[in-house]
Amino acid sequence: TNSKVLIIGMGGLGCPVAEFLSRSGIGSLGIVDHDRISLSNIHRQSLFNEKDLNQQKVKIAKKKLNNINSLTKIKIFNYKLNKSNFQKIIKDYDYIVDGTDNFESKFLINDLSLKYKKFLITGAISKFDGHIFTFNFKNKKEPCLRCFYQEEKISNEILNCEYEGILGTVAGIVGTMQANEILKSILNLSLIHI
């Protein structure tokens, strides 16, 4: 398709999202991450293996995604997301996928997706659990992430994989559900709000 999807975070959620969207023939993917691949990532980040250790996630992800589908255009953003750089890139994409692991980033992604009226799929995982929210901000009456979480009551330790741990299959399931929500929207199928 000609759809453009921006994936923020090439970790346990972003990897399966990118892989399944690429396999599905998405026209354009943007991937944002500033991190390098570490051994502790391998069990939940399906695009990476031991040969990729210490390399930049976005560069390796682009290479592997191009091997899956060379027709998908992939643009990489190898930096930590902030308000300034996110405002510059969000306008070019139809769909925003939040695969981050901290609420500061999640709220920033939420706020700018709302401001620019984007379709946002946000996901989170911890231990054996995960969830996704699908927000179509083109609809002015749509709630946002802040409606469900009060910023002052949240600790980033809730989403910290190093602190809490994560079962790798949970990341794959939640990331696949995020990809599924994007595909359903592109195909004009009914949306699930979980």
Regions found by a protein language model. Give the residues of each.
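Adenine nucleotide-associated cytosolic modules
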Residues: 1-192
